[in-house]
C-alpha cells in the first residue's frame, strides 16, 4: 500500500527525521520524503537534500536583497575588528536568529582570515592573485574547513528561504 507521497510502506522513525532535520536545516516533510526515497539511508537522504537546496539557492540568486544587518566583531584583546553588511530580502528574515548568527560568523571570518574581496568577480583583471586566498566566498570556513563560506551561506538560504548576499566588509587591525 502506498502512502500519500506515493511510497511503499517504509516506516521512517520520527527520531531519524528529527536527526536529519537538525543536520540539514530542511523542513520536516522534506526530510521525511528524502528518507522515504532512500529507504531510510541518512547519507543518501542528506545528499538529496543538499542537491535540492542548491537548486533552490540558484532559483533565489536573482532576487533583490535590500534588507539586512551590519554585524561587528571585535576579537579578544581588542586589536582586531571586522564589520560586515549582510543583506536578505525581508526585514523578517533579517531579525531571525539564523540570519544574525550567519552575520556574526561572517564578521568573525573576516577578522580571522582577512579577505580582500567578497567574490571572484571583484578581483581586478590581470592580477596574479589566488582567488581562494583573497575572496571571502571562496575561503574555507574557520569552524568547518570542509565547507566554503559560500556553502555556509547556501545552507542558511535553504533554512530561511530567502536570497542572502554579502554587500561589503571592513577589517581593522591596531597599528596597520
What residue ranges belong to the model's regions?
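N-terminal assembly/interaction segments in proteins that build large macromolecular machines
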Residues: 2-176
Amino acid at each position: 500500500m502506498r502512502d500519500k507521497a506515493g511510497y511503499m510502506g517504509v516506516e521512517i522513525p520520527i527520531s531519524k527525521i528529527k536527526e536529519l532535520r537538525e543536520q540539514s536545516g530542511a523542513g520536516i516533510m522534506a526530510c521525511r520524503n528524502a528518507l522515504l526515497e532512500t529507504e531510510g539511508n541518512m547519507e543518501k537522504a542528506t545528499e538529496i537534500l543538499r542537491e535540492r537546496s542548491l537548486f533552490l539557492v540558484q532559483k533565489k540568486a536573482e532576487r533583490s536583497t535590500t534588507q539586512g544587518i551590519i554585524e561587528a566583531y571585535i576579537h579578544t584583546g581588542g586589536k582586531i575588528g571586522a564589520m560586515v553588511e549582510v543583506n536578505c530580502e525581508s526585514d523578517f528574515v533579517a531579525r531571525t536568529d539564523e540570519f544574525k548568527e550567519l552575520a556574526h560568523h561572517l564578521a568573525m571570518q573576516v577578522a580571522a582570515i582577512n579577505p580582500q574581496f567578497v567574490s571572484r568577480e571583484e578581483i581586478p583583471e590581470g592580477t596574479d592573485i589566488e582567488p581562494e586566498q583573497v575572496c571571502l566566498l571562496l575561503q574555507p570556513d574557520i569552524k568547518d574547513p570542509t565547507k566554503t563560506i559560500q556553502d555556509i551561506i547556501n545552507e542558511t538560504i535553504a533554512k530561511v528561504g530567502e536570497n542572502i548576499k554579502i554587500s561589503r566588509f571592513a577589517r581593522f587591525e591596531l597599528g596597520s
